[in-house]
């Protein structure tokens, strides 16, 4: 299962699991709501983090701080789950390696 994270927008956080899109808007900071939101969506789908096979994250354009939050969470999850993390540059529409693939 591929998790796609988009924190580029100022007011909301969007994640997608195999093409199904989930969006949340809140007054909380993205750094405070992203992980609980991912957990909530996985629970609704009766999935766990262990079901993820790859993480893709929007690398821009967008809010610099928001993008940092998304990339940081993606890398932390990828590292802890030993799955690949890839960045998707929405401006160019191409997938690029963010930093590494855990081996």
Where are these regions (language model features)?
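DPxDG-like acidic metal-binding loop motif
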Residues: 54, 58-59, 65-83
């Amino acid at each position: 299962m591929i998790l796609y994270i988009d924190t580029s927008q100022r007011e909301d956080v969007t994640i997608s699991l195999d093409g199904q899109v989930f969006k949340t808007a809140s007054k909380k900071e993205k750094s405070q709501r992203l992980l609980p939101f991912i957990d909530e969506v996985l629970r609704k789908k009766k999935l766990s983090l262990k079901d993820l096979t790859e993480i893709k994250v929007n690398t821009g354009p967008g809010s610099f701080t928001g993008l940092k939050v998304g990339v940081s969470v993606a890398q932390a999850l990828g590292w802890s789950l030993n799955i690949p993390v890839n960045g998707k540059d929405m401006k160019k529409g191409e997938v690029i390696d963010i930093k590494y693939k855990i081996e």
